[in-house]
């Protein structure tokens, strides 16, 4: 019997196809009709609202397979966390990813400190003002914030129903690299 790949394995395989220019995902008209009847995404993703970051394309997934929450700097606001909880509780996603990306304008502006008070104030910055390190730090901290603020998501991990991960997409190459991954211990 063939083992079904885990959701994270499926997304990483899709990202490999995307990086290699061998995408297979298509969104045919018949698929839209199916989606009008069922909403069962494979994963939930908190990502940046940057127009260059489109999880369905980056992970080579068809319409309906990803529940995407996007906000500048992939900041886990209360509304974003509640949306992710909805995906876990009611849609049954088995994977939650916080997806940062290289060349993030929101993190860059937060580092520059030349913005109106409050704008990007929730971006987690490391003590070293290096853009690459700041992007990785912010992505990891966004996942930690979700885990700190959502008992529902934490319980879903502990019960073995959910895997959570953080990672960064390289805009130039398209490659997504996992930074942290948490799942129930077996």
Regions found by a protein language model. Give the residues of each.
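Short glycine-enriched loops at secondary-structure junctions
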Residues: 47-53, 72-75, 101, 113
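Short, surface-exposed beta-edge/turn micro-motifs
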Residues: 40-43, 94
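Divalent-metal-activated hydrolytic enzyme cores
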Residues: 1-38, 64, 73-91, 106-186
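Catalytic core of membrane glycerolipid acyltransferases/transacylases, capturing the structured
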Residues: 52-68
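Ordered, amphipathic secondary-structure segments that act as subunit-interaction surfaces
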Residues: 80, 93-102
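Short, flexible loop/turn motifs enriched in small residues
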Residues: 38-41, 51-52
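Short beta-strand segments
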Residues: 46-48, 70, 97-101, 165-170
